[in-house]
């Protein structure tokens, strides 16, 4: 061996510190062994320092999460060595007695267990500290006394006494007391930890513990075993089950000798709830990796100190282990760490090369997703209408009779009766024509119920109906008309072509004419006529409401408003009323089916008695003409020969029902023929109206037709029966947003609308161009704002990717067919390009410790890339890919994500956590197969009192035993039949076929996080289910059918100095509740009023009560959702729940919870889905989406405020430039903001 003596001298001086640096040492051949020892020790020390440096560099790759509830884990691969617990570790676990190392475990089985804990959680209390030497002791005695046990509540209090007998016969006693609440079973075990030299056995078997019994021979000298000797640290343990002690409430002493202890695996596990720390040191057989883990329980983080302190403790422990390495161990360990680092850097480099392509493709992929959304979503369109004096009529069944009359059509037709204003009336009577047959078939009282709908107006878009009731009944009258034939006389008009053939006796006779009148159309189209009542009739018409039904509406309209007035006219009676409110409605008609539309309540009643003798009064009368020129109207008399004579005559006005007198006188008492003329003037009853051509007959509610009632010789074509017609007039306007079925994409709708507008504005093209210029300016401002938002999002990583990207797509869609569409797309591409540039910059921060120049070159020469930036970028990329069910392999060449191939890489950065969340969030079934219970635990979710600290909202479904059953029966059914663990697996793989008849109650929670400002978040925790608490005060239970829930909000403030979080429950007003709402929520949750408690105290109790329900249930499903609209749908069900059609077997609480989960995941609900619930959720989701599209969301609100500020600043700059005469600045502003000035 060649020795460099000068080097040895320098190292001896530096290492030993015994001789000054200038001192020379004479080395002889006899000193060869000493030199070898010194050199070996020096090399080992140098290698150890280098190894610790490698560990430190690995630690730099590990990002320390600052999110509350994050469970810190660090795993460092080290070679297997033997390690013992030292003084520092025992100080951490609060040991307090210096004697032999003994631990006892008390296991509490409870029904009040957080969902993230095992059912049987062992609480291990270490109460002895090790000493430098472990003295031998012969035995120890354990005494357990039950001090108190409440079987109903599950509260238990135990007294534990341990007596140790040492080898020198010394005795040491230790006593302590255990107390716990709501426990169902208690078992106690204890561990004896000792260094062993020999284990003989097995000597028997412990049937209760199902373990063999070994004889233990202890090392006599008590020295610590070494690695070379092959001796190891073991634990011997014994379990004492004391269920019977608790159940029987007995006091029992248990004594166990050392030789009866059972041999366990050599693993030490300690958990001290006081210090809130869990240190696990595992030592398995040589040749297998030795792992050091330190874990901090998630719900106890705040009291355990910062993560940095925890990391430092682990690294200190690792340094102590490395200090025991030999030279060969160091070489193996160093190679292992170098390989890990190299492998990690290469894999990171392979994935980093493709990240720019991910971001560039995001826009197109998300547009496809939005396209699919619109193709399957109900759209609300704004609709408005106006009716201006719209008049119509429809017939009502009445007992009527016909009056035979003829008239000649001459001039304009009247609006109601079709009788001309100047018609000539011809009455006739010959050969019994005037006899009236009994044409009325009595049918008794006629009543139309209040479900009757009358269609009064209709077009292609909507139909208007009146909902009314109608009743009529005959009134007793002594007058019966037309019982005999008319006299043999024919009265004709001189203007008509007819032959005078009738005769009458002369000689001063007075002839009484009782002439019924029946108007008759003298054309070939229709035979019209006037009907009059046969006898007096009482009529009552009551209109309840005006209904407007939209033909294509699929559910209830929203944002309704309007005003309608209605006037009814029946005969000579008229009434009017006004309705000032509009509200959504669903109604079903007999002929037209179901409608969704609007209702305008109107309370209008018209009552009258129709009397044939007095109904028309003087409105229609038969009068004489003015015989001014009698020569043209001479009476002709025949007395044995024709010789003309002129006589006086008079004909007074008379009513057509009561008759009148015509007095004829002649000079001779002979038979003569007379000719004269009469008129029938028509008084118009309704002025200034527009008559509607649409006239719909009444639905035959009574099951009769016109032919069965009117049994005369005429056909059913007889129309315009004035005296049995209800005339109406509607005036007013309304507006609403009407739901239409899924249609075309927004861009296509925009194009169609653009074409329609162009057709309308051809006559005003210049004005329209100005308006379009303003719109384009607004679009450009929005795109500029969104570009800034996009850049801010990449940097802050606080906003939701979906919200911003959706706004980008919307703006591009709106401007797609406009003049500046190319600029819009260019601006959007520029935003994406800048984001890619920034991404490339932050991506490189993770390589700050890299020494490989080739890798740096491939990573574009950047200097820095942090794990946090890598994880954030992964969120952007994966959300776009998963939204359209695409894989990274479509855009990447190379390996799978690291978490699938190399578990070591899980602890380098957060990339694998983002991969898992994206796989799980978007219901990608192929990737979800890689999601296991172990990997899900790395998502940092908290199920009990905190919030979800993931980047996505979380929806969780819980099952718990039925509360109305006996507790033991309910728990047994829940555990044995429902089987929550099996149900959880089934929900992960096959949610569509999960049964819903388990003997358990189901409910759900939805938690999301809204970034408020730097270091502050608003957390909303929504609790929803069937039969749960509600703000309406309904009684709740597991069997009730109503939908209930509550929304509780918290503010989370981060203290960046030490990484802690502070959670404050917000006031009930922040959740949108009033004091009355809180009172009702409290009474529905606890079944009492809470007299004497303040509203704030009740709100706090409600929060704790909801937490208790969640903690005591089993979580069977946990989904991470990307859409922000799910929370608004849940709020709609909580605040305005629809009627739930509950069925214990077919549609119960489990159906409700699982179907809401399916809808939130984007799947179709089951065939048990309640229509009203689905419509309400879809309605709220669409309203929120349309608010975004119409610029009414928070995003656009912020954009609007920024735009207003920008415009104000531009306007001020423009005015200042004009005042100072800066023409160049004025021109620049005018060009930049064309159309604004």
Swiss-Prot record:
Active site: 1001, 1149
Domain named PPPDE: residues: 963-1178
MF (Gene Ontology): peptidase activity
Repeat recorded as keyword: no
Keyword annotations: Capsid protein, Virion
Localisation per UniProt entry: Virion
Annotated InterPro entries: PPPDE_dom
Domain of life: Viruses
Main location: virion
Cellular component aspect of the GO annotation: viral capsid
Protein name, entry field: Putative structural protein VP3
Organism from which the protein derives: Lymantria dispar cypovirus 1 (isolate Rao)
């Amino acid at each position: 061996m060649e020795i460099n003596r000068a080097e040895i001298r320098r190292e001896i001086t530096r290492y030993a510190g015994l001789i000054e640096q200038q001192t020379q040492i004479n080395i002889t051949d006899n000193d060869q062994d000493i030199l070898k020892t010194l050199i070996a020790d020096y090399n080992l020390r140098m290698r150890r320092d280098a190894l610790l440096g490698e560990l430190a560099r690995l630690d730099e790759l590990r990002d320390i999460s600052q999110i509350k509830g994050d469970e810190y884990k660090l795993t460092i691969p080290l070679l297997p060595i033997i390690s013992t617990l030292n003084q520092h570790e025992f100080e951490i676990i609060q040991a307090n007695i210096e004697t032999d190392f003994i631990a006892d475990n008390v296991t509490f089985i409870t029904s009040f267990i957080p969902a993230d804990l095992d059912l049987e959680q062992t609480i291990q209390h270490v109460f002895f500290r090790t000493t430098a030497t472990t003295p031998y002791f012969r035995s120890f005695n354990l005494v357990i006394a039950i001090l108190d046990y409440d079987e109903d509540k599950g509260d238990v209090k135990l007294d534990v006494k341990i007596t140790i007998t040492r080898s020198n016969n010394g005795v040491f006693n230790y006593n302590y007391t255990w107390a716990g609440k709501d426990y169902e079973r208690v078992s106690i075990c204890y561990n004896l930890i000792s260094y062993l030299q020999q284990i003989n056995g097995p000597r028997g078997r412990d049937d209760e513990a199902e373990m063999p019994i070994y004889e233990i021979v202890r090392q006599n000298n008590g020295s610590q075993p070494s690695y070379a000797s092959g001796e190891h640290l073991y634990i011997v343990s014994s379990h004492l089950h004391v269920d019977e002690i608790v159940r029987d409430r007995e006091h029992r002493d248990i004594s166990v000798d050392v030789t009866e202890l059972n041999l366990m695996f050599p693993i030490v596990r300690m958990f001290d709830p006081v210090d809130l720390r869990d240190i696990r040191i595992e030592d398995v057989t040589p040749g297998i990796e030795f792992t050091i883990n330190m874990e901090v329980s998630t719900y106890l983080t705040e009291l355990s100190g910062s993560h940095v302190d925890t990391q430092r403790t682990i690294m200190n422990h690792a340094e102590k282990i490395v200090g025991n390495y030999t030279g060969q161990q160091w070489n193996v360990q160093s190679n292992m760490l170098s390989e890990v680092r190299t492998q990690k850097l290469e894999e990171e480099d392979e994935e980093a090369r493709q990240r720019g392509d991910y971001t560039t493709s995001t826009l197109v992929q998300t547009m496809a997703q939005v396209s699919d959304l619109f193709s399957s979503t109900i759209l609300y369109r704004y609709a408005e209408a106006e009716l201006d004096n719209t008049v119509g009529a429809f017939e009502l069944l009445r007992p009527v009779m016909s009056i035979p009359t003829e008239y000649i059509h001459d001039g304009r037709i009247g609006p109601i009766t079709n009788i001309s204003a100047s018609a000539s009336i011809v009455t006739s009577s010959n050969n019994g024509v005037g006899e009236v047959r009994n044409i009325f078939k009595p049918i008794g009282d006629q009543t139309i119920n209040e479900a009757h709908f009358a269609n009064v107006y209709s077009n292609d878009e909507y139909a208007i109906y009146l909902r009314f009731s109608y009743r009529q009944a005959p009134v007793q009258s002594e007058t019966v008309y037309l019982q005999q034939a008319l006299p043999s006389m024919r009265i004709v008009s001189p203007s008509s072509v007819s032959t005078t053939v009738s005769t009458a006796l002369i000689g001063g006779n007075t002839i009484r004419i009782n002439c019924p009148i029946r108007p008759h159309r003298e054309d070939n189209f229709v035979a019209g006529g006037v009907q009059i009542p046969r006898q007096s009739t009482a009529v009552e018409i009551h209109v309840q409401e005006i209904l407007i039904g939209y033909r294509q509406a699929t559910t209830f309209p929203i944002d309704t408003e309007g005003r309608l007035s209605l006037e009814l006219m029946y005969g000579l009676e008229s009434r009017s009323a006004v309705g000032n409110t509009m509200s959504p409605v669903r109604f079903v008609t007999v002929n037209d089916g179901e409608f969704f539309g609007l209702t305008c309540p109107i309370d209008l009643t018209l009552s009258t008695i129709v009397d044939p003798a007095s109904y028309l009064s003087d409105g229609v009368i038969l009068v004489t003409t003015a015989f001014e020129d009698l020569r043209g109207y001479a009476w002709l008399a025949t007395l044995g020969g024709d010789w003309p004579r002129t006589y006086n005559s008079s004909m007074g006005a008379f009513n057509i029902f009561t008759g009148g007198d015509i007095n004829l006188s002649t000079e001779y008492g002979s038979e003569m023929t007379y000719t004269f003329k009469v008129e029938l003037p028509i008084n118009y009853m309704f002025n200034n109206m527009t008559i509607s051509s649409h006239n719909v007959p009444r639905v035959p509610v009574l099951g009769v037709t016109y032919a069965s009632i009117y049994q005369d010789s005429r056909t059913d074509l007889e129309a315009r029966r004035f005296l049995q017609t209800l005339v109406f007039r509607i005036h007013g306007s309304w507006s609403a947003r009407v739901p239409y079925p899924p249609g075309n994409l927004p861009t296509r709708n925009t194009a169609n609308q653009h074409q329609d507008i162009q057709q309308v504005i051809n006559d005003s093209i210049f004005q329209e161009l100005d308006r379009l210029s303003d719109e384009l300016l607004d679009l450009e401002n929005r795109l500029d704002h969104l570009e800034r938002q996009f850049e801010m999002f990449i940097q802050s990583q606080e906003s939701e990717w979906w919200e911003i990207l959706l706004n980008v797509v919307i703006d591009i869609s709106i401007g797609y067919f406009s003049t500046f569409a190319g600029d819009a797309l260019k601006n959007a591409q520029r935003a994406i390009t800048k984001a890619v540039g920034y991404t490339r910059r932050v991506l490189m921060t993770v390589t700050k410790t890299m020494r490989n120049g080739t890798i740096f070159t491939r990573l574009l020469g950047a200097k820095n890339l942090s794990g946090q930036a890598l994880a954030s970028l992964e969120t952007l990329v994966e959300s776009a890919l998963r939204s359209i069910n695409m894989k990274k392999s479509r855009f990447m060449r190379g390996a799978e994500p690291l978490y699938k191939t190399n578990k070591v890489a899980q602890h380098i950065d957060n990339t694998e956590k983002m991969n898992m969340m994206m796989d799980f969030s978007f219901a990608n079934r192929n990737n979800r197969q890689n999601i296991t219970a172990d990997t899900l635990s790395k998502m940092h979710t908290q199920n009990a009192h905190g919030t979800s600290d993931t980047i996505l909202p979380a929806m969780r479904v819980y099952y718990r035993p039925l509360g109305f059953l006996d507790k033991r029966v309910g728990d047994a059914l829940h555990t044995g039949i429902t089987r929550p663990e099996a149900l959880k697996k089934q929900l992960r793989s096959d949610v569509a076929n999960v049964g819903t008849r388990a003997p358990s109650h189901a409910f759900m929670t939805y938690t999301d996080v809204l970034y408020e400002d730097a270091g502050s978040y608003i957390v909303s925790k929504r609790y929803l289910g069937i039969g749960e608490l509600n703000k309406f005060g309904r009684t709740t239970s597991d069997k009730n059918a109503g939908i209930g829930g509550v929304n509780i909000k918290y503010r989370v403030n981060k203290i960046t100095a030490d990484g802690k979080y502070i959670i404050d429950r917000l006031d009930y007003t922040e959740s949108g509740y009033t004091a009355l709402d809180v009172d009702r929520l409290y009474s529905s949750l606890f079944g009492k009023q809470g007299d004497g408690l303040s509203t704030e105290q009740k709100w706090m109790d409600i929060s704790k009560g909801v937490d208790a329900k969640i903690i005591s249930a089993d979580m069977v499903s946990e989904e991470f959702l990307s859409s922000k609209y799910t929370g608004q749908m849940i709020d709609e069900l909580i605040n305005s729940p629809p009627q739930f059609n509950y069925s214990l077997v077919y549609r119960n609480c489990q159906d409700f919870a699982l179907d809401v989960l399916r809808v939130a995941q984007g799947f179709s609900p089951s065939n048990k889905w309640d229509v009203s619930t689905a419509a309400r959720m879809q309605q709220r989701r669409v309203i929120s989406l349309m608010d975004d599209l119409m610029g009414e969301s928070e995003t656009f609100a912020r954009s609007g405020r920024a735009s207003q500020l920008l415009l104000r600043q531009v306007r001020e700059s423009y005015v200042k430039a004009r005042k100072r005469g800066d023409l160049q600045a004025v021109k620049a502003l005018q060009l930049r903001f064309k159309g604004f000035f």
